[in-house]
Amino acid sequence: MKTKISLLLILIIVLSTFSILTSCSKKEAQSTTMPTINGVSLKEYTIVYDAQGLDYNKRAAEYIKSKVLELYQLELSIIDDDETTQAHEIIVGETSRAISESLNAETEGFEFAILSDNGSVALEGDYFVIAAAAYYFVETYLTIADAAVTIEETATIHQPITKEAKNFILLIGDGMGVYQTRIFEYMDYDVDYSDGEKLFYGYMFPYIGSSRTESLSGITDSAAGGTALACGYKTYNKYLGIDENMSPIKSLTELAYELGKSAGVMSTEVSTGATPSSFSVHIEDRDQSSDISQAQTEAELKYGTIIDCGYDYYTASRIHLIENHVVSTLEKVSANENGFFLMYEEAYIDKHCHNNDIKRAYEMVVRFNQAIARFMEFAFYNPETFVLITADHETGRLLPDENGKLQFNFDDHSEADVLIFAYGQGAELFDGVNIENIQISHTIAALMGEENFGDQSVYQSLTKGNK
């Protein structure tokens, strides 16, 4: 018995020693395969971000740090640009460093710039686009083990990396017509949660088209408009997830479940609002709130759909709560290796346009921008992501008057077309088109792998070439 115990102890010691040696060997191998950037070992660099800038820059710096740790078990330091300049720096965003002044590239949309100078590297991109720069930098220069990487000493302009999509994000600005998206050209209100932007972020997207929004009732309401975007069918006003014959029709959230993907429904409106309901229930009257609530609970149980709604906030501290909701939901749905479908609605553009309150409408477009930025950060760090922004309808007939001042001309929905902004592989299908709103969901479904989604008897998925 003692002999057996002794042999067992010897075996444990041998295995433990082998494990330690293997671990050391791996760490040594990883340290020797670390790349150099313009002749300087990666371990000599410090990451620097703009202390006075937007949070996107700090998050991009933290992303680079985390990827270096993951790839090489090397923990680079992060400092802000108020601290002493180091010998070799990776500069993230427009800092006070001299290299940032040298870079100062003219970029448009989702373009970003990279420059190397005197042993340091600088990355710049407008607002959240710095995330695309950080991802590109890591994938292009840091994943090549034992490589001698050279970065140009003149500024180079790049586009985000995209891959075949498995994640699909649909962002809906309720009531957001053309001039709601152009509101920054006419107004300049002080909003404490803005990025200081002077444009709707959709205009940074590479592909822009438009859609027609009429329902079978004529001018659409949000129920029929939401159903068109969710299910690919024209239906009557007040109908949620059902066709003209009151038959249930499959939504993109249900399609995601069938394809093994996760699904999420988000809105600043309560969950029983018309748009989130269009993506989660099949009911003949949008006003049946108790029935909608029960049906949504059943959808969560049956399909695993994450329904996260109801946050109408108007201050900087509270807006961050919306960002937290977005990040949390993205973390949950992206845990599925098959990908996800997620719909997010900014509901209050519509509500304030009904009230003809242009200042509040402006604030809601800014608030929508904040959410869009968070979704786009995710898309840049996860390039297998397709993002589309649109509206279910326009509200208020917002137009410039003869003096060039924006004015409401109505207090209800209008027949006006709405814009489509698209990003990711497949987004080019929407460039310059004027289509029926149902074709948006037809095309998203096709990109997900289902060519025959919705009612395509007249208007088909753009993947089939019918515009």
Model-derived features: positions:
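Bacterial N-terminal signal peptides that target proteins for export
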Residues: 1-9
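Active-site His/acidic residue clusters
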Residues: 273-281, 326-330, 337-374
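Solvent-exposed alpha-helical segments and adjacent loops
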Residues: 29-158
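N-terminal catalytic scaffold of extracellular/periplasmic and nuclease hydrolases
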Residues: 155-311, 394-467
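Bacterial signal peptide processing site
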Residues: 25-27
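Metal-dependent active-site segment of extracytoplasmic phospho-/sulfohydrolases and closely related
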Residues: 13, 178, 368-402
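C-terminal motif of bacterial Sec signal peptides marking the signal peptidase cleavage site
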Residues: 20-23
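Loop/turn elements at helix/coil->beta-strand transitions in domains of secreted/extracellular proteins
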Residues: 43-44, 74-75, 85-88, 164-169, ...
